[in-house]
Amino acid sequence: MGKIVNLLKHSNSTIVNLRHFSGNALLVMTLFFSAIGCKNGIKNDLVKQAKPTIMVIPSDNLLKKNDALKKEIIDGADIYIRDYNCYLINDTKSKTAISIIQKAFIDAGYPLNDLDKNLKQLNDRSLRDEADGVKKDAKTLLLESVQPDIIIELDYSFDMDMNSRNFDREISYTLTAIDAYTNKVFSSNVYSGGKGQDFRTAFEDAIDDKIGTMMSEIDNYFGDIIENGREITVQFNIDRNSTIKLSDTYSSTGESYSEWIQDYMDYYTINGTYKLERNSDYEMHFVNVRIPTQKENGTQLNALGWARQCVKEMREKLKISSSNRAQGLSEVVITIK
């Protein structure tokens, strides 16, 4: 058995002389590698079976057509304010289309966040945020409160077919899959050519043409997240009233705060996956950061939880105070005071 352990330690050997092992040792070795293969197989199965939480929302184009998308200038920046309640009242067909898409995902086993049901809670929270002087639109509030994994944006048209003798309408739609955490578009499926007079019947027939392809693309994308971690951005900066610089040393070994941060990033990311984009005395900015989707105890881990743990470690090990000032699902902004 000792020879097997030594062999596993020296993995540079590509050829094994089986005559060096007894029959029992070969049996143990076979069982060992079979167990590894079984474990990897279970992991792969879990990745394949994992389903992201879905939320279906109307596109900005549909909101604009129904006067439910406004542009405001806040602190010199263009901010788009989305009114989903107004839109769903003005466009009843969209409510039908969303329910058909949702049913398809539910039937396929996906967890779902229902837009209509969450709007009441959203309105209550919006009132509280406005009382606090914080202006946020419906989409931002939805993502922060509901936290779906994937957003499906729907855009559609149901216009009269001028060439039809039966007064048919022609249906077309676009389904866009977006990572709710990074706002990255990873799938877009366009359909056109369906005809009919009843919207529900026409849309049910049309959705079957693309929904299977989109589900496969979603599964592949989410499988990568489960296996390789969720992508976020991480920024460390120094508060304007602080006397600390990231290049300052914090211990007798001469290690700087920036070196500690890089060591932390190496340890608390998936396979040390990140890119240091900016590095100065007052800021370190990391992109393409991959963090686990779960903690060691099996509970979910998001950017907020990751930042909370980092702030705690900095307080305990560096003896400095810091806070996470980020807004959004995929952003960490730790400010050192």
Regions found by a protein language model. Give the residues of each.
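Amphipathic beta-strand/beta-sheet edge segments enriched in Tyr/Trp
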Residues: I150-G196, E331-K337
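C-terminal/domain-edge helix-coil "capping" segments
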Residues: K39-D67, K184-K275, W306, C310, ...
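Catalytic micro-motifs at enzyme active sites that drive phosphoryl/nucleotidyl and oxygen chemistry
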Residues: I42-N44, A138-L142, F158-N166
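Extracytoplasmic
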Residues: Q49-K51, T92, T96, S145-I151, ...
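Solvent-exposed coil/turn segments that connect beta secondary-structure elements
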Residues: S59-L62, N118, S157-D159, T176, ...
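N-terminal segment of the mature soluble domain
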Residues: K65-I151, E255-R315
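Bacterial Sec-dependent N-terminal signal peptides
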Residues: M1-L46
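Extracytoplasmic/secreted cell-surface and envelope-processing proteins
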Residues: K64-N66, L122-R125, D161-R165, I244
